[in-house]
Amino acid sequence: MRDAIAEPVPPPALADTPAAAMEELRPAPPPQPEPDPECCPAARQECMLGESARKSMESDPEDFSDETNTETLYGTSPPSTPRQMKRLSAKHQRNSAGRPASRSNLKEKMNTPSQSPHKDLGKGVETVEEYSYKQEKKIRATLRTTERDHKKNAQCSFMLDSVAGSLPKKSIPDVDLNKPYLSLGCSNAKLPVSMPMPIARTARQTSRTDCPADRLKFFETLRLLLKLTSVSKKKDREQRGQENTAAFWFNRSNELIWLELQAWHAGRTINDQDLFLYTARQAIPDIINEILTFKVNYGSIAFSSNGAGFNGPLVEGQCRTPQETNRVGCSSYHEHLQRQRVSFEQVKRIMELLEYMEALYPSLQALQKDYERYAAKDFEDRVQALCLWLNITKDLNQKLRIMGTVLGIKNLSDIGWPVFEIPSPRPSKGYEPEDEVEDTEVELRELESGTEESDEEPTPSPRVPELRLSTDAILDSRSQGCVSRKLERLESEEDSIGWGTADCGPEASRHCLTSIYRPFVDKALKQMGLRKLILRLHKLMNGSLQRARVALVKDDRPVEFSDFPGPMWGSDYVQLSGTPPSSEQKCSAVSWEELRAMDLPSFEPAFLVLCRVLLNVIHECLKLRLEQRPAGEPSLLSIKQLVRECKEVLKGGLLMKQYYQFMLQEVLGGLEKTDCNMDAFEEDLQKMLMVYFDYMRSWIQMLQQLPQASHSLKNLLEEEWNFTKEITHYIRGGEAQAGKLFCDIAGMLLKSTGSFLESGLQESCAELWTSADDNGAADELRRSVIEISRALKELFHEARERASKALGFAKMLRKDLEIAAEFVLSASARELLDALKAKQYVKVQIPGLENLHVFVPDSLAEEKKIILQLLNAATGKDCSKDPDDVFMDAFLLLTKHGDRARDSEDGWGTWEARAVKIVPQVETVDTLRSMQVDNLLLVVMESAHLVLQRKAFQQSIEGLMTVRHEQTSSQPIIAKGLQQLKNDALELCNRISDAIDRVDHMFTLEFDAEVEESESATLQQYYREAMIQGYNFGFEYHKEVVRLMSGEFRQKIGDKYISFAQKWMNYVLTKCESGRGTRPRWATQGFDFLQAIEPAFISALPEDDFLSLQALMNECIGHVIGKPHSPVTAIHRNSPRPVKVPRCHSDPPNPHLIIPTPEGFSTRSVPSDARTHGNSVAAAAAVAAAATTAAGRPGPGGGDSVPAKPVNTAPDTRGSSVPENDRLASIAAELQFRSLSRHSSPTEERDEPAYPRSDSSGSTRRSWELRTLISQTKDSASKQGPIEAIQKSVRLFEERRYREMRRKNIIGQVCDTPKSYDNVMHVGLRKVTFKWQRGNKIGEGQYGKVYTCISVDTGELMAMKEIRFQPNDHKTIKETADELKIFEGIKHPNLVRYFGVELHREEMYIFMEYCDEGTLEEVSRLGLQEHVIRLYTKQITVAINVLHEHGIVHRDIKGANIFLTSSGLIKLGDFGCSVKLKNNAQTMPGEVNSTLGTAAYMAPEVITRAKGEGHGRAADIWSLGCVVIEMVTGKRPWHEYEHNFQIMYKVGMGHKPPIPERLSPEGKAFLSHCLESDPKIRWTASQLLDHAFVKVCTDEE
C-alpha cells in the first residue's frame, strides 16, 4: 500500500505547505491489527497502543519496508501508480493475514477537491512547471530516505521532535477517539468487550474430612497435573478479547491520524474534512460504472476498416493492390497516430478518475468494504488492461524517440515511425517509476558517449561532442555521394510498420532508406566496434521489447513443436532467453479481451518498428563493409584484419537476424511471415559470406608462397572452419558453399606442396649441373654435393610439414562432412516401404516438403529433438556441440522425388503406418527444399557412427538396395568437393614418388660422370641421407593418406602403397650395404611401413604379384639385417648414417624436428612450445651437433656415428631462440604470420651490450644511470658511521617536533619563494599535487628543455618540460596555457598524457607521460619493414582523427613529435603549434591563417597561405604522408635540400615528395590520397581509417 493520500489539492498548494516534511507523518492504516512505524509518531502510539501492539511493531521490521516486489502484478512494467500500489498491498493483506502491510510513496497529488470527479482532471496538472515538480519530488524523496533510516535505528521520537520543531507552528486540534465520523468505517462498529465469565462448577463438593491424608494428597497432585496439561478456555477467551480490543483501537487511531493529516493538508478542520470526504464518496458508483463501460470515443476521426487495432491488426506483409495502396497509404499512418493520441488522452483521464476515487479512502480494503464492485473480477481485469496498455504505449513511444536521438534523426514522422506527442510531462500520473526514467537517460548518455571512448580509456572526455547528427549533416553527407554507392538499394522501412508494406505510400517511402543510419553507423564502427554497438543497443531496447512481445503474444494460437533455440554462438554478445519470465506471462490472458472490448489501438506498429530499426542498423553495417571492400587484391599484411572485420559483421548480422525472428515469430504467427521481408538482408549476408570466402582463399594462397608456410597453418584453418560451421547454417545456401570452399582449400594445399617439391628439386638440379659445368676441382664438386644434399633434406622436411598440415585438415573435413551413406534401390519403392513398415519405421512429415520422404527407427519416434538434430545434420549444421546426449543408434533415411503424381505411381506417396509431424527451423526447411537427393541417403550425426549404422541397416534390408558410396556428404556439391580432395591427395603420392626418382637419377648421373673412386664413398654417404629423408617423408604421407580414403579410393591408395614399398625395397637392395646382424636405425621407418600394409591391400593383388612381393620382402629383410660378422672392406661404411635433418635458421630449437620419430606424423601435433620447454638442453646439444656436422666433413664412423662433442665457441645467434635484437622486430612478430622467419631483422647478428639497450637519443641509458646513482646513494647511506647516525636521528627528531608545533600553530614557517599558484589558477591549469625529483636532460627543443622526472610518492617515471620566461611575461604564459588546455581536453592511448603543471616566477614545469623508446624519427633512420609501417600509420591516423574530431589542428606532425613506448604504442605529442578551432563541425580548408611547423612536412596551402584563405585540418594529413615516407626511406622528405626556403619553394610550386618504389601498391595508394595538392580533394583522417593500408590487427584475437 502507498502512504495515506492527502485530499487532492492542486500542485501549487503543495509548494505552499511543508508537504515534504509532513510526508513522513502520513499514516496509512491497514485494516490488520499491527501498527506501521512509518505512519504515526511514536509518542502517539505509546499513548494509544497497548504492550502487545508495541511488541508486534518491533517483531518484524522487514514487513514495514517501503519497497515491495511489484514485478508480479502486471508483468509489463513495475506497478508504479499509487492505485497499483494499493491493489498490490490489498492483495498482500488478503494473502498473508496478520502481517503488516507496507506502503509505497505517493508521487503526485490529485486535482482540487472542489472539482467534480467527472471533469477532465488533467487540465489543472498541465499548468504546473516540470522543473518545480522535479525539484519538489527530489527534495521529498531525499527527506524520506534520510528519515526512514533514522526511524529504523530506533531514533523515532528524536526525529519526530526535530521535524516538528522545523515545521511552522500550526495548531492541531485534539482528536476524540470515541467521536463518530462519517468518513471512517470503524466509527459505527461495536466495540468488542471482554468481561470475565463465571464458569459453572460441575464438580461435586466433597468433604475433605472423609478422606485420609494420603488419598487427599494424591487427589491434589492429580488435579494440578491435569491443570498443567490443559489449556484454560477462560484464559483463551480473555486473550482473544484483548487482541481484538488492541487491533480495534490501533485501526481506529490510524484512521483518525489519516483524517487529521488530510484536514491539515487541505487547510480545513477535521469536521469539515470529514463532511467533504463523505460528500465526495457519493460519486464513486458513477466512476466505477464509467470505468466498467469505458470505450474509446474517436469522435470525428474517420478511419478505414483496416486500422491497426486489437480487434483486427493488419499483419505485416499483407498484400494490397496498387490502387488500394495509393488510396489508403499515408492516411492510414496518420489515422493510426490520431487514434493513439486520442486513446492515450482518454485512458489517462480515466486513470486519473481512478486515482481520485482511491484517494478518498485511507486503504483499498476500506474502499472494497464500502463498494463490492471495486473488488470484482471484471473491474480488476479492466483496470489491469488499462494499466498494461498505458505503460507499454508510453514506453515504446519514449524508446522510439530515444532511438531517433541516438541515430541522429529529428523528424521521425517523416520516415513513418508511429510517434505521437504526449501532451503533458506527467501524462499517466507517475505510472513509470523515476528510477526507470533515470536509468533510460543514463543508458542514452552511455550510448551517445560510447562512440567517443576507446577500449583502453573507458572514461569519456568532457569535451566529447554528443553523437547527435542533424538532418542537415545527413543531407550533406548524402549529397557528397557517400550514400549513393552501387550496392545501395531503396529499401523502405514501412514493412516494419503494423499497417503493412504498402501503406506508407510513395511520399513516405522516399524517406525510409536504411542509408539514413549511415553517419551513425560509420562513426560507431570506427570508435567502438560492432560488438559494443550491438551490446548497447540491446541494453537500451531489450527490456521494452520483451515486455511488449509478451503482451502481444496471442494465447489462442495453435502451438506446434518447433526448434528455435537462442543463438549459442552469440553468447559473448547478448544472452537470448527462449522463455520469458514467469511473472510476465500472466498479463496477456486478461488483457486481450479487455483491450478488444475498449477498442484500444494496438501498440504492435511501434513494436515492429523498433525491432526493424535494430535490424536495419546492422544491415547498414553490412552494406558499409561491402562498400569498403578494396578494389584490388588485398595484400598479406592487411588481409588478416579484413577477414576479422568480415567475421565480426557476419556474426553480428546473424545475431540480430535471430533476435528479430525471436521477437516476431509468436507476434506475427510464424517465421514464414517474419522471413518474408528479410530478402534484402539475406542477400547482403550472402554477399558478405562470399567476400569472406574470397578473402580466405586469397589468404591461404599468399601463405603458401612463404618459405616457411607450414608453421601454424593447420591451426588457422581449424579456427576458420569452426567459425564457418557455426554461421553457415543460418545463411541461405551457406553450408554447401562453405564445404566446397574448404575442400578446395585443402586440395590447394596438397597441390602447392607438390609444386613446392618440384620447384625445389628444379633449383637443386640446376645448381648441380651448373657446378658440374664449371669443371672445377674435386673440392668444389664435393662442396657442391654436400650443399645440395643438405638443401634436399631441408626441402623434404618442409614438404613433410606442409603435407602433414594439409592432410590433418583434410581428415577433419572428412570427419565433419562425410556423415551419410548412399544406396541405390535394386527393388521397387513399394517393396522397400513394406520392408520399412515391417521393421516398424516411422515416417517424418515436414509441412511444405511433401516430396521429401524421411524415415526414422521406431525408437526415435518420441525423441523429436533427436530427429530435429538429424535433420539439421543432414543440411550441414554442426551438431557435435549440442548439449543433448547423442544416440548411438540415431539415424534417418532420406529420399526425394519430383512431384506427387509420380510418387503415387511409384508408391512413395502411400504410407499407411505410423507418422510423426516435425516443424524444423526455417533455415533447415530452406536447405532441405533446395537439396538434390537422387538416391536413398542414410544420415547420422557423427561420422564415427556411420559404419556401424550402415552395416546394421544393410543386414536388415538385405537384397533391396546396394551401396553406392560407403561414406559421402548429404549434399552433392560437398560430395564432389570431397572426391576432388581425395584425388588431389592421391596425386601427391605420385609426385612424391617422382621426386625421389628424380633425386636418385640426378646423383647417379653425377657420380658416374665426375666423381673419382676415392671420393665416391664419401659423397655416396650424403646422397643416401637425402634419399632416406625423402623415403621417410613418403612413408609418413602414405600411412596418413590411407585414413583419408573410403570406398573405391581405398583400393587406389592400396596400389600406390604397395608400389612405394616395392620402390624402397629395390633401392635398399641396389644402393645400400648389407647389415651386420642387427636392424640399422635408418631402416626402422621402412620396416614400420611394411608392417602397416593392410590385409585388404594384399588380398586385392593377383597371385603372381603377391608371390613377387613376398619374395622381395624376404630378400630385403635379409639384406638389411645381414650376418653378424660380415667384413667391412671400404674405408668408410657405405650404409647411411642416422639421418639428422639440419635445422633451418628459422626452425624452433626442437629435437623432434632434427630426428624424425618412428611414430610419424602423430608427433607433429604436439605444440612446439611444449616440446621446447622440457627439452632445452637436448635441443641445444642437437643444434651444436647439427652445426658441427654441417661445418666439417663426415668422419669415419660407419652407420652408428659418434655424437659430436660440444665445442666451446661463441654463441650462435641462429641456434638460440629469438634474440633480443631490434624492438621493432619483436613488435612485428605479433602481427606477422607465424611461419615467417624469426630472424628476419637486419640486425640479428648484433651483440647486445651488457647495460640496458638504448635508443639513439640515450634517454633509456640516462634513466638507467639515474637509477644506478640512486641505488649507490642508498648504499653509501647505509655505510655511515655512528656519529653520522646520531646526527641524523637528532635531525629527524627536530623535524618531527617542528612539524608538530606547526600543526598546532605554535610556530610559523618562512617561505623561501612566494607562492605563484594564483597565476596558475587564473589560467585554469591543473597543478601537480605530488612530490618529484628531476633527472637527466633527454632533449631540447624550440620551446624549452625536457628532463626525466621521478614522482617521489609512486616512483613513476615522467617527462618534465621546462619553459623559461621573463617575470610577468604574460604572452609566453598564455601561449603555454593554450598548449596545456589542448592537453587537458583529450585522453587517448595514442596521445601523450598530461599530468599537470607547476608555475614559478621565471619558469614553468609541465609534467607529461614519459615514452621510453624515443621518437619515430630515431627508430626510422634505417627504414622500417612494411608491416611495422602499417601498424604505426594506423595508430598515428587514429590519433589525428581524435584531434580533428575535437576541433584541434596539430600543425607540426613529424617523426620527432611522435613517441614510442615499450608496449609498442605510438603516441602523438608536442602540442606547441596546435590550435583549437572555434567551430568543431567546420571541415573547410580555411580554418587557420598562421604559418607554423616544420618546412619539410608542410602542406602546400600552409606555405602559400592558400591565396589568403588559410589552411585547416587537411594540413595534418599531408604531414602524415610525409611521416610515412620517412618511415619507409629513413629520411625526411626533401632531404636533398639544405635550406627550408628551397623546400618551401618546391612545395609551393606544386611538387610532391616522391613516393618510395619499395612500398606496396596499397601503400602507394594511401600516400597518393595523403599528398593531394588540393586540400579539398585530400582524404580526411576518418576516410583514411577505412583504407586497406591501415587494416592491420593491433591485438591478437
From Swiss-Prot:
One of its GO terms (molecular function) is protein serine kinase activity. Its EC number is 2.7.11.25. InterPro entries: Kinase-like_dom_sf, MAP_kinase_kinase_kinase, MEKK4_N, Prot_kinase_dom, Protein_kinase_ATP_BS, Ser/Thr_kinase_AS. The lineage of its organism: Eukaryota, Metazoa, Chordata, Craniata, Vertebrata. Residues 1-128, 424-465, 1137-1157, 1190-1220, 1233-1263 are annotated as: Disordered. One of its GO terms (cellular component) is cytoplasm. This is Mitogen-activated protein kinase kinase kinase 4. Residues 59-69, 449-458 have a biased composition (Acidic residues). Residues 1210-1219 have a biased composition (Polar residues). PROSITE patterns: PROTEIN_KINASE_ATP, PROTEIN_KINASE_DOM, PROTEIN_KINASE_ST. Its cofactor is Mg(2+). The modification Phosphothreonine is found at residues 440, 451. It catalyses: L-seryl-[protein] + ATP = O-phospho-L-seryl-[protein] + ADP + H(+); L-threonyl-[protein] + ATP = O-phospho-L-threonyl-[protein] + ADP + H(+). The active site is at residue 1452.
